[in-house]
Swiss-Prot record:
Location of the region described as Disordered in the Swiss-Prot/TrEMBL record: 20-85, 205-226
Entry-annotated residues carrying Asymmetric dimethylarginine: R81, R104
Protein name stated in the entry: SWI/SNF-related matrix-associated actin-dependent regulator of chromatin subfamily D member 2
GO-annotated cellular components: bBAF complex; brahma complex; chromatin; kinetochore; nuclear matrix; nucleoplasm; RSC-type complex; SWI/SNF complex
Protein location: Nucleus
Domain SWIB/MDM2 positions: 306-383
Pfam families per UniProt: SWIB (PF02201)
Source taxonomy: Eukaryota, Metazoa, Chordata, Craniata, Vertebrata
Gene3D superfamilies: SWIB/MDM2 domain
GO biological process: chromatin remodeling; nucleosome disassembly; positive regulation of cell differentiation; positive regulation of double-strand break repair; positive regulation of myoblast differentiation; positive regulation of T cell differentiation; regulation of G0 to G1 transition; regulation of G1/S transition of mitotic cell cycle
Phosphothreonine modifications at: T217
PROSITE patterns on file: SWIB_MDM2 (PS51925)
Glycyl lysine isopeptide (Lys-Gly) (interchain with G-Cter in SUMO2) crosslink, residue number(s): K226
């Protein structure tokens, strides 16, 4: 029996054993006689009726599994023939050469390529596996020479010793960096001496006859210049300051109050105050000018600007802890050490503190939680006492002691803190180390490549024949992987491989794909859909 497909392609006659080709073209296979099984082309390796192909994965069944595993088109009655030329067959149009090829219902995505004689995997190239990329990165990051190279070049042991020393050095530097980071979080200060200079000048009043004119006349002296006045200056500097940047005098204080004699200047004009504000401009000193021709007793109250803030303890708690003025964290630490030393923590409920007689007087309770201590401690903390300096403003022109010096202790930032911050922020050495690491990685990779080439040439010089055969086998395996070829080339080069039952099924599918392709081309040319 012969016929023509869509587009006039001649169809080969169906042989009695060509049930697979007939099924591919839509015709039912020859009926099986009594005691006969369906054609091997339609029988699979299992009960599902799938087709077994040597060297490839088996197809899924193309239709309902049954005694004959016959393909049945949806919508067709059992036993009817598939329409041939001129009739709508198969799925909608699509290129048979790509992933969108028209497939028969039930056909898996894997199909026969029209120009190849073996089953193909999907055409899309799989991306490089993540494991291979990760292995490459690890190989690039590895600076250790392989054992085979160390055995070949004994001098490489010196490099391995340097590598071990570098590893220890990196661990030490990393540990020191962590210690520096922890140290920077804490306030690093050191005590320095701040010398305060308090001086005053006196301007006596001028006699009326000293000037040619009087106030209000041309050439006269203003009335304000006739009044005697004095000027007080408060300045200071750090002693033995190694830093190049000098700190302003006002930066050491939170507030400064100058209290003059109330009897001389009255209750409303005897105080001169300066308080730090967020917008305060730092200055090198303070000066106060007032009228007067008498010696004036004054009191300077200097409130230091502690960073972090410090507090003065209640006298009872200060005697108990041995701390007078300190930061809140230091006070809490001293309190905890006292509790631990005197075993005041409850043995069963560890969050409770059993107060002794001193704590009962201070906290006014016999038992309290440890979490309640900060709240109770807030009422026992006060602002630290200011620095009090008593000074006499002298207006006697014969008095040579018009400048007084006072040394006070202040806390300044440790210069080492700035160096540690610069060390952590510096990336110059890190960039240099990274560039050297890249060079080492490239050198190690080059050494490995040279070792591979040496092994290649050494094997070839030792056993040329065996080496060439093994090399060809390796290249053949690589070629199959690169070209995505599935199968056994040794079997495929023999004619008996193509006389197996699967070949007839493959021919039928190839012809069916060609018929579909030609039909779609005719529809596009005629602009109609054949029915």
């Amino acid at each position: 029996m012969s016929g023509r497909g869509a587009g006039g392609f001649p169809l080969p006659p169906l042989s009695p054993g060509g049930g697979a080709v007939a099924a591919a073209l839509g015709a039912p296979p020859p009926p099986a006689g009594p005691g006969m099984l369906p054609s091997p082309a339609l029988r699979g390796p299992g009960p599902s009726g799938g087709m077994g192909v040597p060297g490839a994965a088996a197809f899924r069944p193309m239709g309902p599994a049954g005694p004959a595993a016959q393909y049945q088109r949806p919508g067709m009655s059992p036993g009817s023939r598939m329409p041939m030329a001129g009739l709508q067959v198969g799925p909608p149009a699509g290129s048979p050469f790509g992933t969108a090829a028209p497939l028969r219902p039930g056909m898996p995505p894997t199909m026969m390529d029209p120009f190849r004689k073996r089953l193909l995997v999907p055409q899309a190239q799989p991306p490089m596996p993540a494991q291979r990329r990760g292995l490459k990165r690890r190989k690039m990051a590895d600076k250790v020479l392989p054992q085979r190279i160390r055995e070949l070049v004994p001098e490489s042991q010196a490099y391995m010793d340097l590598l071990a020393f570098e590893r220890k050095l990196d661990q030490t530097i990393a540990r020191k960096r962590m210690e520096i980071q922890e140290a920077i979080k804490k306030p690093l200060t050191q005590k320095r001496k701040l010398r305060i200079y308090i001086s005053n000048t006196f301007s006596p009043s001028k006699a009326d006859g000293d000037n040619a004119g009087t106030a209000g006349t041309p050439g006269g002296t203003p009335a304000a210049d006739k009044v005697a006045s004095w000027e007080l200056r408060v300045e200071g500097k750090l002693l033995d300051d190694p830093s190049k940047q000098k700190r302003k005098f006002s930066s050491f204080f939170k507030s400064l109050v100058i209290e003059l004699d109330k009897e001389l200047y009255g209750p409303d004009n005897h105080l001169v105050e300066w308080h730090r504000m967020p917008t305060t401009q730092e200055t090198d000193g303070f000066q106060v000018k007032r009228p007067g021709d008498l010696n004036v007793k004054c009191t300077l109250l200097l409130m230091l600007d502690h960073q972090p803030p410090q507090y003065k303890l209640d006298p009872r708690l200060a005697r108990l802890l041995g701390v007078h003025t300190q930061t809140r964290a230091a006070i809490m630490q001293a309190l905890w050490l006292y509790i631990k030393h005197n075993q005041l923590q409850d043995g069963h409920e560890r969050e409770y503190i059993n107060c002794n007689r001193y704590f009962r007087q201070i906290f006014s309770c016999g038992r309290l939680r440890f979490s309640e201590i900060p709240m109770k401690l807030a009422g026992l903390l006060q602002h630290p006492d200011p620095i009090v300096i008593n000074h006499v403003i002298s207006v006697d022109p014969n008095d040579q002691k018009k400048t007084a010096c006072y040394d006070i202790d202040v806390e300044v930032d440790d210069p080492l803190k700035a160096q540690m911050s610069n060390f952590l922020a510096s990336t110059t050495n890190q960039q240099e180390i990274a560039s050297l690491d890249v060079k080492i990685h490239e050198t190690i990779e080059s050494i490995n490549q040279l070792k591979t080439q040496r092994d290649f040439m050494l094997s070839f010089s030792t056993e040329p024949q065996d080496f060439i055969q093994e090399w060809l086998r390796s290249q053949r395996r690589d070629l199959k992987i690169i070209t995505d070829v599935i199968g056994n080339p040794e079997e495929e080069r023999r004619a008996a491989f193509y006389h197996q039952p699967w070949a007839q099924e493959a021919v039928g599918r190839h012809i069916f794909a060609k018929v579909q392709q030609r039909r779609q081309e005719l529809e596009q040319v005629l602009g109609i859909r054949l029915t």
